[in-house]
Every structure is written in C-alpha cells, then in structure tokens.
Amino acid sequence: FSIRGDNPDDMRRLLDSVKKQAPHLAGIVHLWSIDTEPTESMTVDALVSSTRMGCFSVMHLVQALAGTTGLAVDDVCLVTHAAQPLDHRDCAPRIAQSPVWGFGRVAINEYQNLRCRLVDLATCSGEEIASLVDELIAGAGQEDEIALHGELRYVHRLVPVSPATVHGIVPPAAEAPKPFRLEVARPGI
C-alpha cells in the first residue's frame, strides 16, 4: 500500500483501510516533513517538494481524519527537524518546515478533537529519537508545542513578570499614563 502525501484521495483511502483493521489508534506520527534541505541550500524545486510533503500532506491528513467516521485517534503528532529556533535571535536551520508548525497551530485550534501536537527535533540524533519515542509513549501531558534538542525538552511557558522587571525593556512612552495621538506621516501607505 503506498500513498502520495499531496493526494487527498490517497489519504482518505489509507484511513478507510486502517479503520477496517483498527477502529481505534493510539496515535499517528507524521514524519514526512523531516527530510528537507537546510535553508542555505534550499532551491525553488526543493521548496515546492518540501511544501508538498510537509504542509500539504499534513493538511490532507487532518482533513481526512476530520472527515472519517468510525475511526478514533488519540493523538496526532507532527514532527519536524530544526524548524523552530529556540532563541528569537536565531534563524531556523530548516525554514521550509516552518509552515508545518503554522498549519499545526491552526489544526490545534480548529480540530481540537484530534489532539494535534507539534514536536521539533534539532538533529534527529539517536538520543532525540529516543526522546521522541518517550514523548509519544508518555503522552506528555497538556503540551502541544515541544522542541526536543538533545536530551532537553523545551515548551512554551507564560511566567508572571513584575513591573520592576519590565522597566527598561518597555519604552517609557508605553508606560506613560497620559493620552497620546498617532498621526499618519504619509497617507496611502
């Protein structure tokens, strides 16, 4: 049985076939998007191919899952390789996979019954693969965006901040309690 990631009919056919054998799945792991070129050596053809195997295949999978009745899936894990930088000053080494995260974030909100999770591996090394397997087996709680870099696990966190900590980071004009007025410097732009 083979399917094309950019073909929605193939994806539906696959899920219909799976449903007949196992109407309940512990999870689906999408790995098609991890084989992209590094950003610096990306060509137009490679970008088109990575979009087809990455974002389009994820879209077709999610749409097929949403349209398939009689198949229960506990978890949908979308795995990327070096698509997310850990520091806002860094560039993602494999930027072509970033749309998978964008679509995955939409799927998390729009298809809440699918329990989509995004996992980014830094190098796809043996220890990261072992961490990914542990992550998938454990269910990993409520986290839906995870970066596994070596043996370290990173997730988003909102942390309370005191006004004293923010002072100096936020420009003083934003802190001023007095009203202000915005003016258009060049109309039409």
Task: Outline where the language-model segments fall.
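4′-phosphopantetheine-dependent carrier domains
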Residues: 1-153, 187-189
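Short N-terminal strand-loop motif that marks the start
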Residues: 145-189
